[in-house]
Amino acid sequence: MMIMERHYTLKEASKILGVSIKTLQRWDKAGKIKCIRTLGGKRRVPESEIKRILGIKDKEQRKIIGYARVSFNAQKDDLERQIQLIKSYAEENGWDIQILKDIGSGLNEKRKNYKKLLKMVMNRKVEKVIIAYPDRLTRFGFETLKEFFKSYGTEIVIINKKHKTPQEELVEDLITIVSHFAGKLYGMHSHKYKKLTKTVKEIVREEDAKEKE
């Protein structure tokens, strides 16, 4: 069965290539990019042309990214463990990887390297993203993000697929949400922020200990 090549609108192509629509129109007139025309006379850019311009000739030339994240500076040891786990996994599979890491909440979508990763994925420069756990990429909406990556030909590889209990997930989400909004309200380095997050964690630990008695 013949597979039809995908054709992008100028707006879609401009986002992927990081140039303006007018630039694409100039390239078309100058013969720098080969566009096709619809029956209505609209320009469309074949995927092969986008790949040619991006320098992506085939799947093997796309990067494999290892992404690691922790919420706080005090968790740098955990960050390093994630990185070593990802590197070991990649080595076992014979993959060359690039590591991207962030220190910040999983609710914060403005993380520097998270934004960089999204841009790389949208530019179709990433074949795989390796993570230690699903919540390292995002605290909520992981399945949606997974489908988003898939639409750009990027696979998410999860090393540790062990599922947490609903209670464990709820506790982690509660701590993350409180930490996130307390940081917004008081500032990440303020005394009020540290006191509030410490209190919440202590309450959670006490309740957990009671249930195990």
Curated annotation (Swiss-Prot):
One of its GO terms (biological process) is DNA recombination. Residues 63-213 form the Resolvase/invertase-type recombinase catalytic domain. The active site is at residue 71. This is Uncharacterized protein MJ0014. One of its GO terms (molecular function) is DNA strand exchange activity. InterPro entries: DNA-bd_dom_put_sf, HTH_17, IS607_transposase-like, Recombinase/Transposase-rel, Resolv_N, Resolvase-like_N_sf, SinI_DNA-bd, Transpos_IS607. NCBIfam families: excise, transpos_IS607. It holds the Pfam family HTH_17. It comes from the Archaea. Gene3D superfamilies: 1.10.1660.10, 1.10.287.2170, Resolvase, N-terminal catalytic domain (3.40.50.1390). It comes from Methanocaldococcus jannaschii (strain ATCC 43067 / DSM 2661 / JAL-1 / JCM 10045 / NBRC 100440). Signal peptide: none annotated.
